[in-house]
């Protein structure tokens, strides 16, 4: 099946956003403002990088012919790529820390299961809703864990836990975005339907914002005490990322490539691995600016 340039373009955009947020995390001065418009814009766009990447992955998996042999080969390849990423970024990860590439490895291995959930419009919608509710009620990712807790892999039990529930990009709840992307491919909702989804999720985002004001806690933080957190990916984050990804999808789907952005998408895995190298070597550089 012929590659779609608009989907490659979305993947290229996800990689650019990921590079941007990793660079910002590496070089942003400790005294930089986190409440200025520029800082909020960078954080907001950066927070959409991984959800967009996984959503595109779900969309592309529908196009793929799945076999057990192919799944095992891809699983081994992606796990090795994750180890290579960790080796290129020892300042951020341990060598066997699960990450987004190991997430893709597990997702492709389990693709027949979650693609079945996405095949029917009703089961697609219910699956996304149930993931959000379960995550809201139980938050198995554990909000008390620190970054070091999430990357530490001292034994096989901890490694497996991080891969499935407690890591930086665990299978649950990130499978949400794979199912979402698969459904976008299978059901191809029209622009009116997509805007209805955006409207509903925006209403929820506003309610979450009101709740943060009432509770007198930050609306969004990477981790810690906030209404919306990335580590772990709580339900307000799932809703916010769903909204942002869908808006980006509306803007870029069926559009002509912008300045060869689609070509970046074809090199997404290579770019993801190698971008950690300059970040590692430059991680000790101290920068100072005002945002």
Residue ranges and their predicted role:
Residues 1-291:
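Alpha-helical transmembrane segments and their immediate juxtamembrane cytosolic regions
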């Amino acid at each position: 099946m012929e590659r779609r340039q608009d989907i490659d373009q979305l993947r290229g955009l996800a990689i650019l956003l990921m590079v941007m947020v990793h660079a910002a995390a590496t070089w942003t001065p400790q005294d930089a403002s986190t409440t200025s418009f520029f800082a909020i814009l960078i954080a907001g766009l950066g927070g959409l990088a991984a959800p967009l990447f996984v959503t595109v992955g779900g969309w592309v998996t529908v196009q793929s012919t799945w076999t057990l042999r192919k799944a095992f080969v891809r699983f081994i390849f992606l796990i090795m790529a994750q180890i290579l990423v960790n080796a290129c970024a020892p300042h951020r990860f341990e060598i066997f820390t699960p990450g987004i590439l190991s997430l893709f490895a597990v997702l492709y291995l389990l693709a027949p299961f979650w693609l079945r959930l996405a095949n029917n419009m009703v089961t697609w919608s219910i699956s996304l809703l149930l993931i959000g509710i379960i995550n809201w009620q139980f938050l198995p990712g554990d909000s008390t864990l620190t970054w070091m807790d999430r990357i530490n892999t001292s034994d096989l039990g901890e490694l497996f836990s991080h891969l499935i529930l407690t890591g930086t990009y665990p299978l649950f709840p990130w499978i949400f975005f794979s199912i979402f992307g698969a459904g976008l491919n299978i059901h191809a909702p029209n622009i009116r339907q997509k805007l209805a989804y955006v409207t509903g999720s925006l209403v929820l985002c506003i309610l979450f914002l009101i709740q943060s004001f009432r509770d007198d806690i930050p609306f969004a933080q990477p981790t810690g005490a906030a209404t919306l957190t990335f580590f772990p990916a709580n339900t307000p984050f799932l809703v916010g990322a769903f909204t942002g990804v869908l808006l980006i999808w509306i803007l870029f789907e069926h559009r002509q490539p912008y300045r060869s952005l689609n070509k970046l998408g074809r090199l997404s895995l290579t770019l993801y691995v190698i971008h950690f190298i300059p970040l590692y070597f430059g991680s000790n550089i101290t920068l100072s600016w005002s945002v």
